[in-house]
Structure formats: structure tokens, C-alpha cells
């Protein structure tokens, strides 16, 4: 009986305990579920919070970028304005310097113009005032100004202007070296000479033994630029105690650098001598390059300087600004600096240079229009007269009439020596830069082919380059070969 009660009590106790255990497990599971739900909700909350923070940060960064862009745009505009102001200040500074440094401009110009020019250009004061006070508006002022004066370009055709070009800037194609320097330049078997010819792209380098100690070096090239580069390269080679093939090749490669520095020096010295203090070395280079450019036998830098002096003096006579007129004359052919072969339009090229260096409007207009017939700018008209005077005066296009005569005589002698077996007619252009040779023969046995004609042309060119008179300026030689060759279509009986 007692055992039965014990089992029942145990069963009852177990049943009660199981119920409590099940309830406990349910409570635990519910709590865990609640924790998981809370954890999930917290994670979702944090994710939204991070997303909002990222969006806010992005919006802030974007706003800062927009603000920086606006600020930079404003600063760029400020810099552009400052650049323009600096350019204006530079021009004013140059003008002020030209007034207070060295001699007054009128005195500088007086040094280069002779009395003949001043007398020919001496206007009558009463007529000058009459033109300036005229109310006739039908004719443009500058046309009335020059058409009504007793002043014609033809009266000034024979004026003399001192050549302001410093000849030491442009080295001669011929010079003398000692024997040790000759060996250094020639090298073993002429290897150094070949390297120089190849790298500098010149025709030849000729060494002539004067006596046992000295050699004459002659650079053959129709390009003054190549001659100058070769001279500068040789000069750098000779100042070294020892050179080998690699060093010579290195010097030849650096020839452009030597030449550019040389041009900058020329331009800087010329402009500063005229109280024009430009900031940019690039403009110095452009201006210095003109020392190695020729137009119909006339050195372009020398021509620009002459034109500048003449234009400035004319401006003084008619009460215009001589400093502006001087720049118009100096820079009117600046476009030729960037055109070694003469194939570009130098007025267009020059106008671009004027824009690049912020030239005054009158100067830019003159550069672009000095070859035009119809101009509406007084400084451009003055420059046209100065340009014509410089280019058209006696001997300007070949240094002198005497040199032109010598040039013609030397060319005639070269042609006659080379083409002795032909009847020849030669024509040398007035500028001295174009030589036309006609070959004539009626003899069948004197007929030559294209290769022989090419060989004759090469021989003539070599002699022209080697001659001290004919090699001063580039000359275009044209060979025209005309012959008569007759034959019968049927044999005569």
C-alpha cells in the first residue's frame, strides 16, 4: 500500500515538475526570441543611422566641392585680370624707363640717321599746321598727312643709315685654328668631321693647310643658322682638352641649345640698348633669330632696326609717339624669326607672336597689315614708309652696290669656268638672290643627260659656297638647258 502511494506521489511530482520545466523552456525561448528581435531592430536602426550619416557627409563634401569650384573660378578670373594689369604695368614701366634711362629716344635715333635724311624730311611748319588743322574729313588723316607734304619716299631713296647690327654676333663661316685643334676636329680618318657634318646637317667642312702650324676651317652651308650652330659646337669642342666621338656627338646634339642661348643674348642686348626691357626670354630669342634671317640679301635684324629708327624719327616729325613707332618698326618683321625657309606668311605668324607677348594694339596692327595697301593706322603707315626706305635704299639688299657688282662678277667667272664648253647666258636678279643660267648648244656631241646636268649644278653650288663673296647670302641657282637636235625621218638618196 505504501509502495503504491510512493509511486503515485513520484508520478505526481514528476508531472508537476515537467509542467514547470516546459513553462520555463517556453519562457526562455520567448526571451531569446525577444533578444533576437531587439538585436535585429538595433542593427536596422544602426544601418539607417550610418546611411543617413554617409548621405549627410556626401552632401557636405559635394557642397564643399561646389564652393571650392566657385572660389577657384573667381580666383582664375582674378589671376587673368592681374595678368592683364601686369602687362599694362610692364608697358608703362618700359615707357618710363625709355624716358629716364640712358639717352632720350630722339638722341638715340639721331645717332643712326644722317643729315641727308633729316634735310629731306624737313617739313614746312606752316604746311604741317594747315594739314593738322584741316576740317576736310573726306580723306583719312594719315593719307592727307603724307600726300600733301613736300616729302616723298623717292627723295630719301639714297639715304645712309649706320648699320646697327653688331657683326660679332654672327660668326663667319671661315676661321683659322692651330694644328692641334685641326686634329681634334678632324679626328682619325676624318671620323669627327663626318660626325659633325651628319649631326649638324651641313654640306661640308673644308680644312686648308696655311702653313705647318695653322689650318683654315671653312663651313659649307647655305643656311646661316646651321653655320652658327656649327661654329658654336666647334667652339665648345675646342675648349676641352680631350674629346672623343661620344663627346663630339653630344656637343652636336646640344647645338640647338647653344644656338637658342646665343639668340636670346642677341635679342636682349639689342632691345635693352634701345631702352626696351622685355620680360620674356622667348621674345629675346625670336628677335635674336632675325640676325640669321635674310630677305633678298638684306639681314632682317639690321632691316628691322633701320625701319624702327626711321619710323620713330618720322613719328617725331609729325608729333606722334616715337616709342610706339620704334616698336612698330622693330617688330614689323618679327614673324620671319619662325620661318627659316620663307614659306610661311610672316604677317600672320608675327601677329600671333604679338598676341602671345601682349604687344600694344598699334604694334600688333602694324605687324599684321604693313604689306596692305589700305590701312587706317598712322603708325602702320609710318612703318610702311620706313620699311620701304630701309629696303629700297641704294645697296641695302646686297650690303652695297659695290658688293652687288662684285657678286655678279664672281658668279659670272664661276659659271664660265664650270661651263666653258657651253654657250651660256646668265641673269642675276636685282636682289642678288636668284641666278638663272641658260645653257645652249647646237652640237650633237655636246648633248648632256640629267645626271651630267646634276653634276654641273653640284659643282657650281660648291664653288659658290666656297667663294668669300658669293657665300655671304643664300642664292637660288636655276639651270635651263636648251638644245636643238634635228634628224630626218627618211634617208636621202
Swiss-Prot record:
Residues 172-241 form the KH domain. Its EC number is 3.1.-.-. PROSITE patterns: HD. The chain crosses the membrane at residues 19-39. It is a single-pass membrane protein. It is found in: Cell membrane. Pfam families: HD (PF01966). One of its GO terms (cellular component) is plasma membrane. Keywords: Cell membrane, Endonuclease, Hydrolase, Membrane, Nuclease, RNA-binding, Transmembrane, Transmembrane helix. Gene3D superfamilies: Hypothetical protein af1432 (1.10.3210.10). Residues 300-392 form the HD domain. One of its GO terms (biological process) is mRNA catabolic process. HAMAP family: RNase_Y (MF_00335). Belongs to the RNase Y family. Endoribonuclease that initiates mRNA decay. This is Ribonuclease Y. It comes from Mycoplasma pneumoniae (strain ATCC 29342 / M129 / Subtype 1). The gene is rny.
